[in-house]
Regions:
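Mature extracytoplasmic/periplasmic domains
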Residues: 6-36, 41-48, 53-61, 319-361
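Immediate post-signal peptide segment of exported/extracytoplasmic ligand-binding proteins
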Residues: 52-68, 205-208
């Protein structure tokens, strides 16, 4: 509140303490007797809601066991889920440890790990999950799945469940996924392509009047090819790196030869339709398939990136959330993690996703 008389300010509402995500709460007005009304538009719901807020004295607030949520990049959807968990759970409350606010986020996180100050909930999205597993940092969630009457591994898409598994165990939950691949016209790449780098270079030779990619720099394709196959070059247990294999030399040759960046002034969709550009690196969800079919104006195929195994289409997991093996409140952590895998949450994923049309797991 603001006083015109003396220009003083008075806190009327504490968003964080009230478990309100300010970016989705608006038009809040006082209606007297310590109450306020406002509109809340949660990501997890399709419709806005009228919400009543009531002032509570500190002594009336029930104490809860605090769970810490550690992340290098805080996502609005997770914030929304945490707020709803805090509102509905009478025993536990989650508080954020956002390492992105630190000058060196990864170093700050590493220091907490070394000192034993590990958050209860770990957001390992895009991180080296296997490395954390081998260090014993993540709890095996398989027993929690097995004992849960509502959330089961059997409910996951089989191929997704297999990709999430490490040494026959599950170390994180993941509510949604995308697909990373190379897309092209089916008549060019074939309906079922398994190729290595040499075969992809031969494919390029068969189309001398076209280029493989529209405007993709060498370093970007190199990064993708290494990132998706990093375990072939790095032994996380010993720290030994092997970059002198024939396959890796082939990758370097491929990137140097086929990935020259263009000026990007030409119309990409037109070049794809006319066969002047053959492939496009994409990260897609289920609804995006029709978009690319319309872009090509033809039947399309997801050919995948080249590798020696011939399986170069990869899952991109959104929100990989794990449990610290050092947590003293593991049951509470599971109460939060399981929320993402329940049917009611899974059923709303495609309705609320603002980026790609991620598919529920």
């Amino acid at each position: 509140g603001y006083s015109i008389k003396d220009s003083s300010q008075t806190k009327l509402l504490d968003y964080a303490a009230s478990n309100i995500q300010s970016s989705y709460a608006y038009s809040i007005v006082p209606v007297g007797d310590g109450q306020m009304l406002g509109i809340a538009d949660f990501l997890a719901d399709k419709d806005a809601k009228l919400v009543a807020y009531r002032k509570v004295e500190p002594g009336e607030v029930r104490e809860k066991t605090v769970l810490t949520y550690g992340t290098l990049q805080l996502d609005d959807r997770v914030k929304d889920a945490v707020m709803q968990f805090n509102q509905n759970n009478t025993q536990y409350e989650i508080r954020f440890k956002d390492y992105s606010e630190e000058e060196d986020p990864e170093t700050a996180f590493a220091k907490d790990v070394v000192s034993g100050n590990v958050p209860d909930i770990l957001d390992v999205t895009g991180m080296s999950v296997r490395q954390y597993v081998e260090k014993g940092l993540l709890e095996d969630l398989t027993p929690y799945y097995d004992q849960d009457e509502e959330v089961n591994v059997e409910d996951l898409i089989p191929s997704v469940a297999e990709a999430m598994k490490m040494d026959e165990k599950y170390y994180y939950v993941c509510p949604a996924f995308l697909i990373s691949s190379l897309v092209g016209k089916e008549k060019d790449v074939g309906a079922n392509i398994d190729w290595d780098v040499r075969q992809l270079m031969q494919f390029a030779d068969q189309h001398p009047s076209a280029r493989l990619f529209y405007d993709t720099e060498k370093k970007d394709i190199l990064n993708i090819l290494i990132a998706y196959n990093i375990s072939k070059y790095v032994d996380w247990k010993t720290g030994e790196c092997t970059f002198d294999k024939e396959e890796f030399r082939g990758i370097l040759e491929f990137c140097n030869r086929e990935c020259d960046s263009q000026d990007g002034t030409e119309n990409e969709a037109e070049l794809l339709r006319n066969g002047k550009v053959l492939l496009k690196p994409v990260v897609v969800g289920a609804e995006d398939i029709e978009i690319y079919r319309a872009m090509y104006q033809d039947d399309i195929a997801f050919a995948g990136y080249p590798n020696e195994q011939g399986r170069g289409t990869y899952f991109v997991f959104q929100h990989q959330l794990g449990m610290s093996s050092q947590s003293k409140n593991k049951e509470g952590v599971w109460e939060f993690l399981r929320m993402f895998m329940k049917l009611d949450y899974q059923g709303k994923i495609q309705d609320v996703n603002e980026m790609n049309a991620a598919a529920p797991t």
